[in-house]
Each structure stands twice: as C-alpha cells, then as structure tokens.
Amino acid sequence: MFESLSNRLTGVIQGLRGKGRLTDADIEATTREIRLALFEADVSLPVVRAFVHRIKERARGTEVSAALNPAQQIVKIVNEELIGILGGETRQLAFAKTPPTVVMLAGLQGSGKTTLAGKLAVRLRRQGHTPLLVACDLQRPAAVNQLQVVGERAGVPVFAPHPGASPDSGPGDPVAVASAGLVEARAKHFDVVIVDTAGRLGIDDELMAQAGAIREAINPDEVLFVLDAMIGQDAVTTAAAFGAGVGFTGVVLTKLDGDARGGAALSVREVTGVPILFATTGEKLDDFDVFHPDRMASRILGMGDVLSLIEQAEQVFDAEQAEAAAAKIVAGELTLEDFLEQMLAVRKMGLIGNLLGMLPGAGQVKEVLEQVDDKQLDRLQAIIRGMTPQERADPKIINASRRLRIANGSGVTVSEVNQLVDRFFEARKMMSSVLGGMGIPGMGRKSATRKSKGGKGKKRARGPTSPKVRSPFGPARPGMPDMMNMPPSFPDLSQMPDGLNELPPGLAAFDLSKLKFPGKT
C-alpha cells in the first residue's frame, strides 16, 4: 500500500547522501519533495503541514548542523516524525481486571468487522484466552450466518440468539443481544467478549444511536473502530465523526495489502488522537498483526521490517524441529522430506513476495519481487509428494526411470524433476560447508576425513549441476529453508542491491543468533 510513498521518500533520502553540509536550499528542496510525496499518498492536509513544519524546524537546528553526517541525521528526523504521526509507541489491547474483557467492534459496512472479529478471536485464543463472539449485526442479511462461519473456522463459539435480518424473522434488538451475550460469557466463564455490531454505508444518526446504546449497555473495555485503509480521506472523516459522536479507544486498519495510496493510515492517528492497535493484510485468519509505528515507519522509508519477519518465523517454526534440521544439515543428511516440511512452514508465514518485501532495500527491486510466483513452490511440493518415502529419505536412488515416474505422477516435466534433485544436492553440500566454516562442532573433522578419503585418486561420478550462485541472504539459519533451493523461474536474487543483508539503522547491534524460539531456554 505504501509503495508509491516509499519510493518517493527513498528517492529524497538518496538525494541527500554524499552531502557534507546541508544548506537552507537543500532543506527547502527536501521538505518540498516530502510534502509532494505525502500529498500524492492522500495524507490529510493538516497532517502534512504539521509534519513538514516539524521536519524543517529540526533540520535547521543544532542536531543537524552539529552532526558528523547531516544527511543521515535528516533521515533519522524523518523516521522519528513518521513514528510520531503513526502513534509513537505500540499500544496493546487493554484487558479488564475482572473478566470478561469486552471488546466492541464498530465501523462502516464492508470495512471488514466480521472477519476481524474472527482474526482477533484466533489471536486471543492462541494467547490462552477463551473468547466468545456475539452477533449484534441484525440488519445486514446473512451477517449472523457469516459470523458463525468465521467462528467455526476460528474454533471460537458464537452467541447468536437471533438469526438476523430475513423475511421470516422480525427485526431484532442488538442492544438486548449484546447484554445477553455478556451474561452468557459470565455464566460460562469466557474471559473475552467480542461484540460484532452493524455497519452503515455512511455515518448517520441511526448508526450513532445504535452504537451509543450498545456501548452504554455493555460498557466495553475497548471500542475498536474498524477502518478500511483503501477509501482514503473518507475513512479519516468517518473516524473523526464517529469519535465525536460515540467515541472509540483504538483503530484497526484493514486491507493494508491493497494498492491504494495509504494516506488514511498516516492521517487517522494524528486526526483522531486515538492509537492504531492492529492491522490486517489479507482475508485469512492469520493475516492479522499488532500495529508497530516504528516498524511501519521503517518499511515506508525502505529500511525493511526484520523484527516482524523474525516474529512470523517464531510462530511457524518448532524449536525441536529446527534443532533437528540443523543437526542434519551439519551431518550432511538433510532429506527431501525435511525440505518439504521447511517449505510448508515458510508457506504458513505468507506470500514469499511479502516476506522478501520485509527485507531492507526491497523497494529498490520491486520488479524482481513481482516475478516471485508462489505457484512454483506448489510445483516443488507436488514433485516431492510424488516420491516414495524411500526416495525422499535417499534422493541418490532416484534414477532415470524413477524420475520419469515422478514427473508423470506430479504433472511436471522430467527436466523439472532433474533440476529439483540436482539443486537439492548442491544446496545441501553448500549448507554443510557453510556451517562447517562457522565452527560447528564436528564439521572440521568430518570434512578432513572426507578429504583424506577422497585423496586416493578415486573420481566420483557427478551428474548435471546448476551454476553456483552466492545467496544474498547469507547462510541458511537452522530450521529455515535455504533460499538457494528455488525453482529456475525465480529471479536471480544475487543481483539485488546493497542493503538487503543489513539491518535498519538502530538495529545494527541486533544479534540474530541470540534469538530465543518458543520452547527454547
């Protein structure tokens, strides 16, 4: 969503590099470009004016004039001001001292409230809570049924005493349903109640009155206004009107994966004064994240979001499996079965293009990322699943006739099977040598033994191999699939620009080796 803004701001930053001293003309030109970039992103006019004014004042102050690298100091100022308009610190959901915690969802029709209710319930359930969904949208046809479907997918019970709007039933009372849902939660010991309310095509008196009545009846701990980030300044106007009429404690931005300009996300916090709590980036129940202003600012400035990428990996990779895979890599015994498990885990993290987009400098290779096709991973998965357990455990036994059978069974060509097998052997060899060079215990002795055995003049047969390409991601981490083991149609990631192998400014001292995975002490 922020691609256009990110490209413009990145261009402004690059234009400052190499300048030892910034003149007033440089500052004026820089702030003018920033102003135009924000206007193009559909950011609210008052927000743009205040943002640019603060940058200009700080750029002319002593923190820039006394800096050893004034250009880098400007980047720091822009980053800090972006974090400021996005909310500053990360705001977590506030839980009641005495359960149940009541969360009320409000917003316009089509903003994604019902789907968000399921996403929030899944997140809370994984954190050990026992949520209950309450269906109070009794006006939109099939709204209650939709929430029941979402609740079933999320594995969370739904309280729906009224079927909702239909020719066979009269109008229901959402206030009574909300109150009854709270009684149900207390009786059955649910510790979180998520109330899904009705939306409108626009703010009107009826919407305000109904939302106000529900809020007064259940006294929620959190009122989250669900905002469609793709509708631009209308979203900010709507949020401001709802905040003045009913009030809310937090904002949830939906559809951040869309191609809109994203000005609403940069404006809503500054205009309403209410923090952004969550953001959604897709329709799946897992496409839901806590909103981190600092990480979002880092992504907008093209510095990536490495910490979010690490957190996603922590959620899908099991610590014991990661250690077992690392041991197999060290011993040179990684199998295609292990590779399949790793690939499936990566798929759980989301689209490959989105994951690569979290890396620093990814905005500079937009065309390359657009070529990444997740369907190629499906073809690799089909090839491996077409093998017998013995062939996955020992790919060396896959001869020509077996490769033909695998190709016919998985719907691919023999050439694709050959490429997968050959590249797997090459990647396994590379990972073993890399880990050995990192001082992994036992690797040095094992390598020396192999070398001495191979010094008797015996030549090993070798099949066709693919050209060796240095991975821009460095050595494969334990439990993570090696990015070298990609299908031939993937772009050449070795041609990516400098910066992809670096953490954003301020995170340079972050030691990935000290990261603790779940269940690991």
UniProtKB/Swiss-Prot annotation:
GO terms for biological process: SRP-dependent cotranslational protein targeting to membrane. GTP binds at residues 107-114, 196-200, 254-257. It comes from the Bacteria. Its EC number is 3.6.5.4. Gene3D superfamilies: P-loop containing nucleotide triphosphate hydrolases, Signal recognition particle SRP54, nucleotide-binding domain, Signal recognition particle, SRP54 subunit, M-domain. Keywords: Cytoplasm, GTP-binding, Hydrolase, Nucleotide-binding, Ribonucleoprotein, RNA-binding, Signal recognition particle. Residues 447-462 have a biased composition (Basic residues). Its main location: cytoplasm. One of its GO terms (molecular function) is GTP binding. GO terms for cellular component: signal recognition particle. CDD domains: SRP_G. Residues 436-505 are annotated as: Disordered. InterPro entries: AAA+_ATPase, P-loop_NTPase, Signal_recog_part_SRP54_M_sf, Signal_recog_particl_SRP54_hlx, Signal_recog_particle_SRP54_M, SRP, SRP54, SRP54_GTPase_dom. Coiled coil: none annotated. It catalyses: GTP + H2O = GDP + phosphate + H(+). It is found in: Cytoplasm. It is an enzyme of class 3 (hydrolase). SMART domains: AAA, SRP54, SRP54_N. Belongs to the GTP-binding SRP family. SRP54 subfamily. HAMAP family: SRP54. NCBIfam families: ffh. Composed of three domains: the N-terminal N domain, which is responsible for interactions with the ribosome, the central G domain, which binds GTP, and the C-terminal M domain, which binds the RNA and the signal sequence of the RNC. Part of the signal recognition particle protein translocation system, which is composed of SRP and FtsY. Involved in targeting and insertion of nascent membrane proteins into the cytoplasmic membrane. Binds to the hydrophobic signal sequence of the ribosome-nascent chain (RNC) as it emerges from the ribosomes. The SRP-RNC complex is then targeted to the cytoplasmic membrane where it interacts with the SRP receptor FtsY. This is Signal recognition particle protein. It comes from Mycobacterium leprae (strain TN). The lineage of its organism: Bacteria, Bacillati, Actinomycetota, Actinomycetes, Mycobacteriales.
